[in-house]
């Protein structure tokens, strides 16, 4: 059996793809893979913050099109890059074991948010990260920082930024336990990550039931529960990348804990929801966040 797998061509994308394919291989050793590299809008446009590009799914649209057109069987993504609704005919069908979902302050000096010097230049092109940083440290400067993980880290090493806010997962996947820079991990109560961060996801055609079954067997159970809760949150909260909303689920034993947050106008709000149904937990967290977003609280 041979599967054609569509993915982006960055080093991190390839590592994530290999990680998910190894899980599939573990349950179906005879399977073979052919990798199809796809360029996306997000790869091509590097001179604008993501929220200014004005295209939904800038890191996933072209990759998923390869599956819809029959050019590939599986599309592999960082789950955080997928919009709340996929194109008709496509379904989410598989999830990797989760890397740490948190964001971190990345710097050469080992700064935490509280120890950043007044007026420090902090890089991020994420509205969510920028608004939370401004709410916590209104005395620092926040400016856009685009590029792959290596590019952003190199700009910090070169002294162009005092620090950046980046995903722990991407750094650990690229460098393992010894990155070339210091990380101060941010608890989700301080800066909640985007839904899906740290999980690699597979998208397939809805009609390919045999492949859906295979990917379900290959999926990490804990990550699957967390993904279900976070996707429900994303769908119910009804906000895109231009709104500073984050949320992360933690599946433990028979319960799911959800921590979500919203930041705007120099203020941040955090909610915590616990339950045994991941869909309901994600929906309840979204309802609480919408009260702040819509000005009801």
From Swiss-Prot:
The modification S-(dipyrrolylmethanemethyl)cysteine is found at residue 241. Pfam families: Porphobil_deam, Porphobil_deamC. GO terms for cellular component: cytoplasm. SUPFAM superfamilies: Periplasmic binding protein-like II (SSF53850), Porphobilinogen deaminase (hydroxymethylbilane synthase), C-terminal domain (SSF54782). InterPro entries: HemC (IPR000860), Porphobilin_deaminase_cofac_BS (IPR022419), Porphobilin_deaminase_N (IPR022417), Porphobilinogen_deaminase_C (IPR022418), Porphobilinogen_deaminase_C_sf (IPR036803). Its EC number is 2.5.1.61. GO terms for molecular function: hydroxymethylbilane synthase activity. Keywords: Porphyrin biosynthesis, Transferase. Belongs to the HMBS family. PANTHER family: PORPHOBILINOGEN DEAMINASE (PTHR11557:SF0). Tetrapolymerization of the monopyrrole PBG into the hydroxymethylbilane pre-uroporphyrinogen in several discrete steps. This is Probable porphobilinogen deaminase. It comes from Pyrobaculum arsenaticum (strain DSM 13514 / JCM 11321 / PZ6). The gene is hemC.
